[in-house]
């Protein structure tokens, strides 16, 4: 473990995904770059990631984007965590699916907040 690549920990906030729909992806990148000096890595035309303190990214694909920022937790065992979410009263709204870099699922907590959990 080094300062650049800290060890991931199950159940800890790991990633923040924010919507960038309606043609705002380039404007958001320009804004955060200009205002805060952020840099970005593009993963195709609809996703751009940042690593500025807490890693995160902007989702421009309306079919994939949440309406609000999406906190993303990390899990070493995605299926076990999905069962724990359901057993605790959460509702899975997107079952486990693959994406570049891993797999994840989305859930809604009892207050209606959507979050996701991912694993490598």
Label every model-predicted segment:
Residues 15, 20, 31, 36-39, ...:
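Tryptophan-centric aromatic hotspots in well-structured domains and transmembrane helices
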Residues 36-69, 114-119:
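Conserved short beta-strand elements that form part of the metal-binding/catalytic scaffold
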């Amino acid at each position: 473990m080094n300062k650049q690549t800290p060890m991931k920990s199950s159940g800890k906030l790991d990633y923040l995904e924010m919507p960038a729909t309606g043609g705002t992806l380039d404007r958001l990148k320009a804004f955060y770059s200009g205002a805060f000096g952020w840099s970005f890595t593009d993963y195709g035309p609809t996703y751009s990631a940042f690593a500025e303190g807490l890693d995160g990214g902007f989702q421009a694909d309306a079919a994939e984007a949440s309406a609000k920022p999406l906190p993303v937790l990390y899990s070493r065992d995605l299926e076990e965590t999905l069962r724990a979410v359901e057993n605790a009263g959460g509702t899975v709204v997107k079952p486990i699916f693959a994406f570049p870099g891993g797999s994840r699922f989305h859930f809604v907590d009892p207050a209606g907040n959507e979050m996701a959990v991912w694993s490598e």
